[in-house]
Amino acid sequence: KEGYIVDYHTGCKYTCAKLGDNDYCVRECRLRYYQSAHGYCYAFACWCTHLYEAAVVWPLPNKRCK
């Protein structure tokens, strides 16, 4: 599974400025999911790959970014 990291409180994606390989996104994906996850900056938000199927990613059901 893959997808954007989402903030559970706001419903917003984790933003990033440096597109492509991005240490911040790798770190956040691994903290949020697990150590074998990978991340990069895509469309100015952190995109995570190699996630488990039950991982919660953006968009959250019934919660819009404010």
Curated annotation (Swiss-Prot):
Gene3D superfamilies: Knottin, scorpion toxin-like. Pfam families: Toxin_3 (PF00537). It is found in: Secreted. Expressed by the venom gland. Its main location: secreted. The keyword Amino-acid biosynthesis does not apply. InterPro entries: LCN-type_CS_alpha_beta_dom, Scorpion_toxin-like, Scorpion_toxin-like_sf, Scorpion_toxinL, Scorpion_toxinL/defensin. Disulfide bonds join C12-C65, C16-C41, C25-C46, C29-C48. The keyword Secreted applies. CDD domains: neurotoxins_LC_scorpion. Residues 1-66 form the LCN-type CS-alpha/beta domain. Keywords: Amidation, Disulfide bond, Ion channel impairing toxin, Neurotoxin, Secreted, Toxin, Voltage-gated sodium channel impairing toxin. Transmembrane segments: none annotated. The modification Lysine amide is found at K66. Beta toxins bind voltage independently at site-4 of sodium channels (Nav) and shift the activation voltage toward more negative potentials, thereby affecting sodium channel activation CC and promoting spontaneous and repetitive firing. Has the structural arrangement of an alpha-helix connected to antiparallel beta-sheets by disulfide bonds (CS-alpha/beta). Belongs to the long (4 C-C) scorpion toxin superfamily. Sodium channel inhibitor family. Beta subfamily. This is Beta-toxin ChFII.9. It comes from Centruroides hirsutipalpus (Scorpion).
